[in-house]
């Protein structure tokens, strides 16, 4: 076992992975046979449950881990549903399940899903698309590398709340994936 200490590590991990909802055969996201996912350990660039599993894994061996919602994208919160006036979506051809993007008061990009709509109102869901889901990951650690102080600082200011860590966009991710398949609805 690797048994790395989260607080003392200044390394990036490189992994291949695929993820399914537990009990399903449908792959939600995968980078197998593509560019590895690289993330800086301890900077919330991926979900907590997967990071913990990576730190315990043997390099070069396929591992499997089931991650509860609390260690993934959180439990589904009905309070994250919001009804807004339809005119806020003027010029947009709405479809149930489509992803839309907006900005928070502090200018962070946020993804939401159109749950339902009428002629006057739209029901928007701000939960992550995988909130409330138990996820089954199959992954292989390809290796670790030392990271510079600049990379660590950049991860905290640019991509530290990315898709896998903070329910936002794909900031700071290398390889175009992060294990969450944010584009699905």
From Swiss-Prot:
Gene3D superfamilies: 2.40.10.330, 3.10.50.40. It is an enzyme of class 5 (isomerase). It is found in: Cytoplasm. Ni(2+) binds at residues 163-164, 178. InterPro entries: PPIase_dom_sf, PPIase_FKBP_dom, SlpA/SlyD-like_ins_sf. Residues 1-74 are annotated as: PPIase first part. One of its GO terms (biological process) is protein refolding. Residues 134-156 are annotated as: PPIase second part. Coiled coil: none annotated. GO terms for cellular component: cytosol. It holds the Pfam family FKBP_C. It comes from the Bacteria. Keywords: Chaperone, Cytoplasm, Isomerase, Metal-binding, Nickel, Rotamase. It catalyses: [protein]-peptidylproline (omega=180) = [protein]-peptidylproline (omega=0). GO terms for molecular function: metal ion binding; peptidyl-prolyl cis-trans isomerase activity. The keyword Glycosyltransferase does not apply. Residues 81-125 are annotated as: IF-chaperone. The N-terminal region consists of two globular folded domains that contain prolyl isomerase and chaperone activities. The C-terminal region binds nickel ions. Folding helper with both chaperone and peptidyl-prolyl cis-trans isomerase (PPIase) activities. Chaperone activity prevents aggregation of unfolded or partially folded proteins and promotes their correct folding. PPIases catalyze the cis-trans isomerization of Xaa-Pro bonds of peptides, which accelerates slow steps of protein folding and thus shortens the lifetime of intermediates. Both strategies lower the concentration of intermediates and increase the productivity and yield of the folding reaction. Belongs to the FKBP-type PPIase family. This is FKBP-type peptidyl-prolyl cis-trans isomerase SlyD.
